[in-house]
């Protein structure tokens, strides 16, 4: 089956292509060309002058559509994934916050089942914790937080192959051994919920930690002790040129001015956008899965208002925030939501850009950057056909 999308501004790795077309054959991109002549036998989609861009690659998300990945069930996973696909996400790494090993095993079993399905948007499991600094726990469950334990993580990574990312605080005892081990298994090691200083971050990077979890959140910046000033985790990460970062670009977790600063220092190639969304995202629900969490001012907070606890945002809102509030070019905002996370997670060979031979993960955005249509693996996502 052939589908041809014409009459739109197409974002390619080389820049914008005007008046061209994207030809889809089953689940792959057959061609991206500057010719928009109709192909015989193809179903024609008129983009009506809108933006044709890659689908979003979400690497840090806890739930959506009223369901949380911590539930561990197939029903919850499918509902949350479907909710985010309505907003332009076409690839997703479900995230668990600090959990018990039985909870991780249940979620891993569900993840593996979904990954095995043909054309699945689920690409792997992300573990946010539970090896964190208790002082920087934020919305994490404190009773689950502990130091890295090889008697836990080695058997877990031996028995399952769906875990693609695992976050930890590098200053903890055993964190360097943990980083070296998980990266030896092809798992992305990320620093998060940490008070690490420059020496910690430098050593962590050398041990395999190449990424930073929700940059600026749950980590200190520049600070004073008595009369002296010290760099924080934030500045330390800036100083490691090749370290990648992710930002919750809802304009609340990180203000637009700081989003622009991250963009200017780390650049498109080392900055990706994440929702860090909870169950209430992409839904009418005003109740979080975690009873400790309230929704107020358009964000999730701990009930005592001591910390933010996640977002209610979606991928399309991240792009709008970066463009409309942080004043970043649309092409760069889209790349940070697609190409960069795909590179970070090692799936850029098939995801993250509109190129011949890649998976047909495509979204169409109107002039206000609202989602008007989404294709995941060449199939139109139900409920997104707002062009027709």
Spans of features found by a protein language model:
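C-terminal cap of metal-dependent C-N hydrolases
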Residues: 8, 288, 343, 353-388
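Alpha-helical scaffold segments that flank or form the walls of functional sites
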Residues: 50-52, 59, 69-121, 144-159, ...
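Divalent metal-dependent hydrolysis catalytic cores, especially in the metallo-beta-lactamase
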Residues: 62, 78-107, 120-133, 160-171, ...
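Active-site gating loops and adjacent loop-to-helix segments of metal-dependent hydrolytic enzymes
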Residues: 82-93, 134-160, 203-244, 284-308, ...
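Conserved, mostly hydrophobic/aromatic
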Residues: 127, 182, 212, 322, ...
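Active-site core of metal-dependent hydrolases
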Residues: 158-283
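His/Asp/Glu-enriched, well-ordered alpha-helical/loop segment
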Residues: 229-247, 263-275, 280-365
């Amino acid at each position: 089956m052939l589908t041809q999308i014409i009459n739109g501004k197409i974002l390619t790795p080389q820049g914008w292509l005007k008046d061209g077309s994207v030809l889809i054959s089953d689940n792959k991109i057959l061609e991206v060309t500057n010719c928009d002549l109709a192909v015989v036998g193809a179903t024609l989609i008129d983009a009506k002058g809108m933006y044709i861009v890659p689908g979003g690659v979400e690497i840090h998300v806890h739930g959506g559509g009223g369901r949380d990945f911590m539930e561990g069930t197939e029903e919850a996973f499918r509902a949350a994934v479907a909710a985010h696909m309505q907003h332009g996400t076409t690839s997703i790494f479900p995230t668990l916050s600090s959990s018990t090993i039985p909870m991780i095993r249940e979620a891993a079993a569900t993840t593996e089942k979904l990954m095995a399905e043909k054309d699945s948007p689920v690409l792997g499991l992300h573990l946010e914790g539970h090896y964190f600094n208790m002082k920087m726990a934020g919305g994490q469950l404190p009773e689950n937080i502990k130091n890295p334990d090889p008697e836990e993580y080695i058997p877990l990574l031996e028995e399952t192959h769906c875990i693609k990312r695992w976050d930890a605080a590098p200053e903890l005892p055993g964190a360097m051994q943990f980083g070296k081990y998980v990266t030896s298994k092809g798992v992305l090691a990320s620093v998060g919920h940490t008070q690490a200083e420059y020496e910690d971050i430098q050593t962590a990077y050398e041990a395999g930690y190449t990424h930073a979890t929700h940059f600026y959140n749950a980590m200190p910046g520049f600070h004073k002790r008595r009369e002296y000033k010290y760099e924080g985790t934030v500045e330390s990460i800036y100083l490691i040129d090749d370290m990648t970062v992710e930002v919750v670009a809802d304009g609340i977790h990180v203000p637009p001015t700081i989003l622009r600063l991250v963009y200017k220092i780390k650049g498109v190639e080392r900055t990706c956008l994440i929702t860090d969304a909870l169950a209430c995202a992409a839904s009418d629900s005003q109740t979080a899965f975690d009873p400790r969490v309230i929704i107020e001012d358009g964000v999730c907070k701990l009930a005592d208002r001591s910390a933010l606890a996640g977002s209610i945002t979606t991928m399309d809102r991240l792009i709008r925030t970066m463009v409309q509030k942080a004043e970043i070019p649309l092409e760069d905002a889209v790349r940070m939501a697609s190409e960069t996370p795909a590179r970070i997670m090692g799936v850029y060979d098939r995801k993250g850009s509109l190129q011949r031979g890649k998976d047909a993960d495509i979204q169409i955005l109107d002039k206000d950057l609202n989602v008007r249509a989404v294709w995941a693996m060449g199939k139109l996502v139900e409920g997104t056909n707002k062009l027709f």
